[in-house]
């Protein structure tokens, strides 16, 4: 398992600089090294890069919380509201098809886009920036049309399915190259880590912003629940007209207004990213004539031990946090009885996460990333146990929400901070292959979305077996118990499994420092005017 991991990193750090930098044929190279290390990003550059993460989070949060209720209650013509059994409206089955197909397509597009990016040539704008530039107009158009109710009776399901899948494709064409851009904004590990901390702060704020904008503008669209003849509680569509403060048409306009605001945020953030960030090419990469073939690169990436261990560990921890996220509103509403407080609890979690991301950035710089993983993610366990055992208490629930936000911040920051270390390690072992960065990032996003789909399926099936009543004001005790397990016990088990896998992750702080020295020697050798293919062959043999 670990036959040569320590030895390989040691040789990369020790033999590489000695064999290359001490060459008597290039004595001036050592004198140039201090200047090459000054590749710091300004705060403005980091903010411009960080703002590029907001569109994905703002739109994803709005769709995640509101698309289902929009398809069921709003995506129909005015005359169909009264005749709630009209065959022309988007019913629950059609809505489930739209949501499932859209989510599945979203996961599939990540490796497909990664494939296309890996084959993209380097242009005057870079390799990644053209994807961000040309996907933005199509993404905002598709997003706006998702929230538009077409004025024709037939084919509404196809309308929403088309534009939902189109938007997911375009936002993937934006987000995958944006994620891979981390490797090209700077060659310094510390600068990339700092920029990642800025990015995670903005992305957490983006989730808060998406929820706030959509919730405040379309909050009137919520349907109340009523008691039926069997003493169970169901929602009434006609109640929207009796108890709502806006008409159905005004509700549709409210969704369009919210979409327009979010589209403006998307465009502004994309423009700032494009104008404020310059994609930098590695000197040693420029010597290669063309990128590695995709499937060969995929085989090399998937055989890279640190990457597999990293994504497997985060797959379990991501699944844990997504189970909590997907069932938190239902848990607060039915198990804890805080129907009117869940919005504020969500806000407490996200604000806590936003405020603590800089603290985690300092922590991982001071104590190392593996230590930050253990401390940050495991800190959620005692609070989940407390939630499982305590009685319904609003003050304690708020305290737990704030504490949970601290762990959420670590879960947001650490994967994106550790992925560049894995890619650096890969580049040292495969110095002649480039263009694999989109593969690393796209497959990490793919596995994250896979975890999201699994958590959604597990939750839905579990609640269905427990007898969940759709849109009920209360639920049977079995449903409350199931929600308790989904939000507390199941995530605890998954977190412990993930932390166990992280024990096998080989890149610690010492290995990171060794890799940094070896990469710097590789860059200096490649950028030197006297660099030859003989030296590159020597470098590959040493590594």
Swiss-Prot record:
InterPro entries named among the record's database cross-references: MFS_2, MFS_trans_sf
Membrane-spanning residues: 41-70, 95-115, 128-147, 158-182, 190-221, 242-275, 307-333, 345-363, 368-389, 393-429, 440-466, 479-502
Membrane-topology descriptor: Multi-pass membrane protein
Entry keyword annotation includes Transmembrane helix: yes
Record's keyword terms, sorted: Cell membrane, Disease variant, Disulfide bond, Endoplasmic reticulum, Glycoprotein, Lipid transport, Membrane, Primary microcephaly, Symport, Transmembrane, Transmembrane helix, Transport
Matches recorded under PANTHER family: MAJOR FACILITATOR SUPERFAMILY DOMAIN-CONTAINING PROTEIN, SODIUM-DEPENDENT LYSOPHOSPHATIDYLCHOLINE SYMPORTER 1
Name this polypeptide is given: Sodium-dependent lysophosphatidylcholine symporter 1
Taxonomic source organism: Homo sapiens
């Amino acid at each position: 398992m670990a036959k040569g991991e320590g030895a390989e990193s040691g040789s990369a750090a020790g033999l590489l600089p000695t064999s290359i930098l001490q060459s008597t044929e290039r004595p001036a190279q050592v004198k140039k090294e201090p200047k090459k290390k000054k590749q710091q990003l300004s705060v403005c550059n980091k903010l411009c890069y960080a703002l590029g993460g907001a569109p994905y989070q703002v739109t994803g949060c709005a769709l995640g919380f509101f698309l289902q209720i929009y398809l069921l209650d709003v995506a129909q013509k005015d005359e169909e509201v009264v005749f709630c059994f009209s065959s022309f409206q988007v019913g629950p089955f059609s809505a489930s098809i739209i949501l499932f197909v859209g989510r599945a397509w979203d996961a599939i597009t990540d490796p497909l886009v990664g494939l296309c990016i890996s084959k993209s040539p380097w242009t005057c704008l870079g390799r990644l920036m053209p994807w961000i530039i040309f996907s933005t107009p199509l993404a905002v158009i598709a997003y706006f049309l998702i929230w538009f109710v077409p004025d024709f009776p037939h084919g509404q399901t196809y309308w929403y399915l088309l534009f939902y899948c189109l938007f997911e494709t375009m936002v993937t064409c934006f987000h995958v190259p944006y994620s891979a851009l981390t490797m090209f904004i700077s060659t310094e590990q510390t600068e990339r880590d700092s920029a990642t901390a800025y990015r995670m702060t903005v992305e957490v704020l983006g989730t808060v912003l998406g929820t706030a904008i959509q919730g405040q503008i379309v909050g009137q669209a919520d349907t109340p629940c009523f008691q039926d003849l069997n003493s169970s509680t169901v929602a009434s569509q006609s109640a929207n007209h009796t108890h709502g403060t806006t008409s159905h048409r005004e509700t549709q306009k409210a969704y369009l207004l919210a979409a327009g605001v979010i589209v403006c945020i998307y465009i502004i953030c994309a423009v700032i990213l494009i104008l404020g960030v310059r994609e930098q090419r590695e000197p040693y990469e420029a010597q290669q004539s063309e990128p590695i073939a995709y499937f060969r690169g995929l085989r090399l990436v998937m055989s890279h031990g640190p990457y597999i261990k990293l994504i497997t560990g985060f797959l379990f921890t991501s699944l844990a946090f997504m189970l909590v996220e997907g069932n938190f509103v239902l848990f607060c509403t039915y198990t804890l009885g805080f129907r009117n407080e869940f919005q504020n609890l969500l806000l407490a979690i996200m604000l806590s996460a936003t405020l603590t991301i800089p603290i985690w950035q300092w922590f991982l710089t001071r104590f190392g990333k593996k230590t930050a993983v253990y401390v940050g993610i495991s800190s959620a366990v005692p609070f989940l146990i407390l939630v499982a055992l305590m009685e319904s208490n609003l003050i304690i629930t708020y305290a737990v929400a704030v504490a949970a936000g601290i762990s959420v911040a670590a879960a947001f920051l650490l994967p994106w901070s550790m992925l560049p270390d894995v890619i650096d390690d890969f580049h040292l072992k495969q110095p002649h292959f480039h263009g694999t960065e989109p593969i690393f990032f796209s497959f990490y996003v793919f596995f994250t979305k896979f975890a999201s789909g699994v958590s959604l399926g597990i939750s839905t099936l579990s609640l269905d077996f427990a007898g969940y009543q759709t849109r009920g004001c209360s639920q049977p005790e079995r449903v409350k118990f199931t929600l308790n397990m989904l939000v507390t016990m199941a995530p605890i088990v998954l977190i412990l499994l993930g932390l166990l896998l992280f024990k096998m992750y080989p890149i610690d702080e010492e290995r990171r420092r060794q890799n940094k020295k070896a990469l710097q020697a590789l860059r200096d050798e490649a950028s030197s005017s006297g660099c030859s293919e003989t030296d590159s062959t020597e470098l590959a043999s040493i590594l």
